[in-house]
Amino acid sequence: MLEGVIRESITKANAKALKKDGYLIANVYGKGIENVNCAFKLNPFIKYLKEKKHLIFPVKLGDKTFEVVVQEYQKNPVTNELIHVDLLAVTKGVKSKFKVPVKHQGTPVGLKNKGILMLSKKRISVECAPEHLPDHYLVDVAPLDVNESVLVRDLEKHENVKILDHDSIAVIGVIKAK
């Protein structure tokens, strides 16, 4: 479980000092809870995010534990280093909006026909309660030929999960190489 520190002071100088000490500035918020300004050690946070199996994960701040999901993050445009993260605290039974990653498997037929695999949408917007949240959408790209794509309406449907993206948006496809 990730452990963070609660920030008593939210001044710019305090944030700079924390960043200099290797901390990532974060904000935990959600329905029915007060915003918590906090900070996590940067390297353990990144390592934990890469190793986690589910979108929802626990964090401990002071004496409280929250079930959270990464809602938004900011990176330095030059160094690509993570500088801020917003964590949404979720409550069982309460619907929220989430962004679920898209993963693909297989090698498209179109790659042999001089095509290029194009991932158009890396995340799908959904609305559901946390207990129904899928960890990812898996797309089999093996049957795709040149100029074929998988649309949002072609994704597997999960019970009690409403996809918010428009049905006709392409998620992944094979385009012709120039």
UniProtKB/Swiss-Prot annotation:
It comes from the Bacteria. CDD domains: Ribosomal_L25_TL5_CTC. InterPro entries: Rbsml_bL25/Gln-tRNA_synth_N (IPR020056), Ribosomal_bL25/Gln-tRNA_synth (IPR011035), Ribosomal_bL25_b-dom (IPR020057), Ribosomal_bL25_C (IPR037121), Ribosomal_bL25_long (IPR001021), Ribosomal_L25_dom (IPR029751), Ribosomal_uL5_bac-type (IPR020930). One of its GO terms (biological process) is translation. GO terms for cellular component: cytosolic large ribosomal subunit. One of its GO terms (molecular function) is structural constituent of ribosome. Keywords: Ribonucleoprotein, Ribosomal protein, RNA-binding, rRNA-binding. Disulfide bonds: none annotated. Part of the 50S ribosomal subunit; part of the 5S rRNA/L5/L18/L25 subcomplex. Contacts the 5S rRNA. Binds to the 5S rRNA independently of L5 and L18. This is one of the proteins that binds to the 5S RNA in the ribosome where it forms part of the central protuberance. Belongs to the bacterial ribosomal protein bL25 family. CTC subfamily. This is Large ribosomal subunit protein bL25. It comes from Helicobacter pylori (strain P12).
